[in-house]
């Protein structure tokens, strides 16, 4: 523990010098404020009333997301957390023990979109990390610009690589808490999103955000786009000039704790056989780890799966707080920070690994450092802090199988062939040598089957019927548990007390989802090229921490059912602003001390 504390102090001291070199940009003078003499007494009274209302609001909302942080990590590793990190939030905040995502798929983009829109993919439009776009006739990313289909993109990427494209929030179809707050304050509130992943920075911040910043694996810079401003702020340019990515990618990754026994106790053996996946070597899956730059365009990709990319984010976040003047006046600002490295590590090693345990302990210490920094700059008494995750993760299937659980991988190609064979059998013309059904299926993406609707109309095929043909065929493939059809979901024809069906319905968007949605059996998932993944409607993927700390909430442990979709409406209630446009979450009233900060 002594070594850990010294490391944290050293990091804080070294970074203080970096902050000073960046300057403390006189942001308060730059903020737009109503000014000039007041000549109408009634107007003066109204302004004083408004000042009183805003003075009671938190000056900063800080949303901390740890990508792929399952709820049980709090229990498995909690006694090893330090006092100022997650232990502090559990002690001083309101914590919900039964917070589950109420949608499927449980991926990064839908999770991050849910957090600040207060609603599900069916309403906010972010149905997956990527999906088949019928209009574009290709797979599109959740933050690729909808109109970026040419070599002349609508927006420019600042400080990125030559082949990297600008990302935007324009596929998000609902407002966020930040959007509503900026409308309430006429743009005076600042809303900034930060992450390694573009989607994790962009989606929680919203469409009317001040800025979103993410990490370029091509340049090692923190980047953004002309969607937000005409040029990158000077302080960001200065931060990038410090080349912190070069420093962190050179850092070896040893275990944080000196005692390997603690890791064996909580995570089993190191370098378990199920971690050796694909081309991984024994050295790749064993502590200590080392990183080096790629010799390809994505030079800094190895840093993604290093815990030190979280340190890079921490430094950048502290620089943003200082240089943007966040939390320095009565207009509430929002800062969202998503630690992505935990997800990369979890995918490569699984949730029951030394690496996942180690990065979880390191993240706890990074959160403690951030809370201390915010306390010194703004005051935690003036801050609403939220801690959660975007999803959980399943055990590595081979690990589950070794424990006599039904773990396996389902071949996408075999699944697709079974579906096509059933369609040929039902609709093929026996007197023709050509397969007339060959163009009926456009894509199998994220367990969604997309049909060629034009081809079905051409051959007068009933969509409702072919949905059932394809779904029944999928059920014959080992590992597929259930299916739901577009026809069924558009009618909301699901059992009211079926939580799996409800999560599928909440994840279904009629414009973006497929025509048949498949659900795998627990501990089984569709073929992937990494050891562990997520996306199911089962508890290991849906159950996440939900902690809110700050004025207006009674600290304690709450056992009521909750969902991360409840975060945005609860914060809106506390701040006294309009809830996001499509908000479907509930206000977590059981923890509220006062109705709102009005």
Each language-model region and where it sits:
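A long, amphipathic alpha-helix that forms part
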Residues: 47, 54-56, 81, 303-329, ...
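Bacterial N-terminal signal peptides
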Residues: 11-23
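Active-site-proximal N-terminal segment of extracellular/periplasmic enzymes that hydrolyze or transfer
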Residues: 36-94
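Active-site regions of oxyanion-processing enzymes, predominantly non-cytosolic
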Residues: 188-195, 201-202, 264-268, 310-343, ...
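Secreted, luminal/periplasmic, and some membrane-associated catalytic domains
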Residues: 66, 98, 107, 129-166, ...
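Short, structured active-site-proximal loop/turn typified by the sulfatase FGly-forming signature C/S-X-P-X-R
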Residues: 74-124, 190-194
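Active-site His/acidic residue clusters
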Residues: 202-211, 289-305, 328-363, 399-401
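Long, low-complexity, polar/charged, intrinsically disordered or flexibly structured peripheral segments
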Residues: 244-322, 326
């Amino acid at each position: 523990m002594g070594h850990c504390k010294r490391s944290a102090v050293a990091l804080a001291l070294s970074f203080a010098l970096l902050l000073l070199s960046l300057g403390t940009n006189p942001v308060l003078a730059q903020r737009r404020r109503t000014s000039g003499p007041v000549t109408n007494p009634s107007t003066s009274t109204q302004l004083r009333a408004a000042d009183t209302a805003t003075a009671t609001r938190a000056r900063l909302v800080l949303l901390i997301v740890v990508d792929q942080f399952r709820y049980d990590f709090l229990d498995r590793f909690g006694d090893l957390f330090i006092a100022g990190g997650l232990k502090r939030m559990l002690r001083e905040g309101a914590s919900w023990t039964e917070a589950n995502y109420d949608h499927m798929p449980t991926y990064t983009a839908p999770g991050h979109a849910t957090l600040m829109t207060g609603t599900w993919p069916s309403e906010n439009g972010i149905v997956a990390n990527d999906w088949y776009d019928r209009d574009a006739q290709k797979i599109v990313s959740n933050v690729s610009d909808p109109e970026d289909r040419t070599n002349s993109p609508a927006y420019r990427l600042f400080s990125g690589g030559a082949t990297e494209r600008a990302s935007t929030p324009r596929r998000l179809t609902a407002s966020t808490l930040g959007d509503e707050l900026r409308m309430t304050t006429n743009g005076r509130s600042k809303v900034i999103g930060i992450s390694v992943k573009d989607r994790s920075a962009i989606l929680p911040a919203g469409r009317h955000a001040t800025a979103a910043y993410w990490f370029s694996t091509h340049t090692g810079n923190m980047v953004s786009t002309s969607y937000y401003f005409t040029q990158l702020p000077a302080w960001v340019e200065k931060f990038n000039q410090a080349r912190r990515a070069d420093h962190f990618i050179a850092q070896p990754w040893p275990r944080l704790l000196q005692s390997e026994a603690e890791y064996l106790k909580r995570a089993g053996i190191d370098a378990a056989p199920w971690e050796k996946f694909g081309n991984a070597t024994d050295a790749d899956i064993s502590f200590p780890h080392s990183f080096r730059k790629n010799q390809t365009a994505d030079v800094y990709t190895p840093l993604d799966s290093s815990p030190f990319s979280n340190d890079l984010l921490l430094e950048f976040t502290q620089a943003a707080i200082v240089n943007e003047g966040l939390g320095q006046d009565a207009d509430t600002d929002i800062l969202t920070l998503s630690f992505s490295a935990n997800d990369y590590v979890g995918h490569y090693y699984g949730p029951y690994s030394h690496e996942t345990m180690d990065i979880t302990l390191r993240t706890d210490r990074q959160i403690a450092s951030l809370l201390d920094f915010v306390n010194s700059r703004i005051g935690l008494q003036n801050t609403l802090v939220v801690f959660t995750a975007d999803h959980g993760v399943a055990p590595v299937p081979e690990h589950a199988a070794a424990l006599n659980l039904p773990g396996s991988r389902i071949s996408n190609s075999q699944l697709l062939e079974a579906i096509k064979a059933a369609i040929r059998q039902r609709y093929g013309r026996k007197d023709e040598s050509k397969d007339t059904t060959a163009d009926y299926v456009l894509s199998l993406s994220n367990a969604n089957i997309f049909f060629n609707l034009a081809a079905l109309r051409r051959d007068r095929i009933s969509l409702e019927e072919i949905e059932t043909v394809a779904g029944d065929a999928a059920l014959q493939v080992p590992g597929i548990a259930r299916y739901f059809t577009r026809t069924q979901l558009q009618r909301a024809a699901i059992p009211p007390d079926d939580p799996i069906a409800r999560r599928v319905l909440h994840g279904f968007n009629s414009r973006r989802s497929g025509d048949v949605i498949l659900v795998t059996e627990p501990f089984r998932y569709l073929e992937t090229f990494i050891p562990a993944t997520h996306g199911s409607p089962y508890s290991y993927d849906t159950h996440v921490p939900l902690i809110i700390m700050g004025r207006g909430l009674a600290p304690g442990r709450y056992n009521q059912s909750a969902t991360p979709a409840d975060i945005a409406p609860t914060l809106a209630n506390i701040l006294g602003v309009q809830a996001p446009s499509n908000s479907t979450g509930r206000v977590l009233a059981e923890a509220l001390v006062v109705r709102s900060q009005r």
